[in-house]
């Protein structure tokens, strides 16, 4: 399961999606999320799915990596589907104890909710897969720049988010190493019920926290050695600049959102 968590990984490439400005990709993801949450019909969901498919093909990110990253979300998907199927009022699909509690409206809501969670996850995965942590930090800091007038530590917030994303794969790899070492000493993480499995994971926490604090201390030392003192007066080697492809991508994203809002109004 740990190896299936792919959030924070970056797949280097030279595709048009990789070459987009990080600010463009961040704004495009926001437009995508708004469009997804406004999709209320099969047609609008199909439109959002088509946009996602085009982006995946254009990015050349392995589909296997995207689907593997969805495995940790399956529990949420299953729980959401069950809650919608059995607890949404409407016309029952049949008679009896089981079918009498399942409604057509519940099935429809469950399908839409599952699609929403899956497409939302894949869209956010695609952002981190095609954008390096440094570029993501620069883009986020630039977009949040106006908040500096409110004396908010924008650079520090962006740096914290970038470091958190960067260290997710590292901590997962470290956890896997610790589990492998303890399995070699006879530890059992697979058998037993949910509570027993949770108790079996407790011995992993102490070495994992020790490793995390050690890595954090090493990172802090490395940043101090490079004379890092926050964003005040800091210059950039690569200055972000919008190009024609960025304007085209944002225009297409806005057009898709406008189309979905229009279809939501006229198509049920």
Positions of the model-derived regions?
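Membrane-helix interfacial "entry" motifs
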Residues: 14, 37, 61-65, 97, ...
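Extended cationic-aromatic binding surfaces that line active-site or macromolecule-binding grooves
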Residues: 55-59, 64, 72-76, 80
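A general structural signal for short secondary-structure boundary/capping elements
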Residues: 63, 79-84, 99-102, 227, ...
């Amino acid at each position: 399961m740990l190896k299936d968590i792919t959030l924070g990984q970056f797949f280097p490439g030279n595709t048009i999606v990789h070459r987009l400005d990080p600010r463009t990709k961040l704004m495009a993801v926001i437009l995508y999320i708004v469009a997804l949450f406004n999709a209320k019909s099969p047609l609008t969901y199909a439109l959002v799915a088509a946009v996602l498919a085009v982006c995946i093909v254009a990015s050349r990110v392995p589909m296997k990596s995207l689907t593997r990253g969805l495995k940790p979300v399956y529990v949420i998907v299953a729980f959401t589907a069950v809650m919608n199927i059995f607890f949404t009022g409407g016309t029952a699909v049949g008679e009896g104890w089981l079918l009498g509690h399942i409604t057509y409206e519940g099935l429809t809501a469950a399908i839409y909710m599952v699609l929403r969670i899956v497409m939302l996850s894949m869209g956010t995965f695609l952002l981190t897969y095609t954008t390096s942590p440094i570029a993501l930090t620069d883009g986020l800091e630039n977009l949040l720049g106006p908040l500096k007038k409110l004396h908010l530590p924008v650079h520090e917030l962006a740096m914290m988010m970038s470091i958190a994303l960067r260290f997710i794969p590292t901590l997962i790899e470290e956890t896997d190493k610790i589990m492998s070492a303890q399995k070699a000493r006879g530890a059992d993480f697979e058998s037993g019920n949910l509570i027993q499995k949770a108790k079996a994971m407790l011995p992993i926490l102490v070495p994992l926290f020790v490793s995390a604090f050690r890595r954090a201390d090493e990172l802090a030392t490395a940043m101090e050695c490079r004379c890092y003192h926050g964003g005040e007066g800091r210059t950039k080697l690569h200055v972000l600049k919008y190009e024609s492809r960025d304007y085209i991508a944002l225009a297409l994203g806005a057009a898709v959102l406008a189309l979905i809002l229009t279809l939501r109004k006229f198509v049920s």
